[in-house]
Design a protein with these regions (language model features):
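An alpha-helical, amphipathic repeat domain used for nucleic-acid recognition
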Residues: 1-159
């Protein structure tokens, strides 16, 4: 029950090609191979070989993706966790990469997101909803909105 368009392309070759483009979790790689109609046994064998040669490593892939999102300063910790969970990484593994003192970073990121989206303080509720949709906690949201309003007031005074 192989793919009809290229019968000699094995699950291992397909998985290797997928991993060459981007690291995937084991769960996501299994899904992608299943969608391509490879038999379960062939998928299991391919995954086993990829793990053996360390081409497939959930911890490495999760850490790399976490760092990329964390360093970009565009995502809340909750949003990073949700994206990684959706990508097939286990919650325990995701939590392993969370720094313990991320609140200061969260406030800084929320403030920068507000500055990028809003050029002047508009409706406070709209700003709060925007940050809430990004996954920020209420205390971070209120603090960032207050800081944004003060920053905008100071900019207006200087003009």
């Amino acid at each position: 029950m192989r793919r009809q368009n290229n019968p000699e392309r094995t699950a291992l070759i397909c998985a290797t090609d997928l991993l060459a483009r981007q690291d995937h979790s084991e769960v996501r790689l299994r899904q992608k191979l299943a969608v391509r109609k490879y038999p379960k046994e062939e998928i299991d064998d391919a995954i086993e070989k990829l793990k053996k040669y360390n081409y497939l490593n959930d911890e490495r892939a999760c850490g790399y993706q976490f760092d990329m999102m964390y360093q970009s300063n565009r995502y809340s910790m909750r949003q990073i966790s949700a994206k990684l969970f959706t990508a097939g990484f286990k919650e325990e593994l995701i939590n392993k990469f969370k720094p313990e003192d991320y609140e200061e970073r969260e406030e800084r990121v929320a403030f920068h997101l507000l500055k990028a989206k809003y050029k002047n303080p508009t409706d406070i509720r709209k700003m709060q909803q925007f940050l809430y949709a990004k996954g920020f906690e209420y205390s971070i949201i209120t603090s960032a909105v207050e800081k944004f309003q003060l920053d905008m007031e100071n900019d207006n005074i200087e003009r």
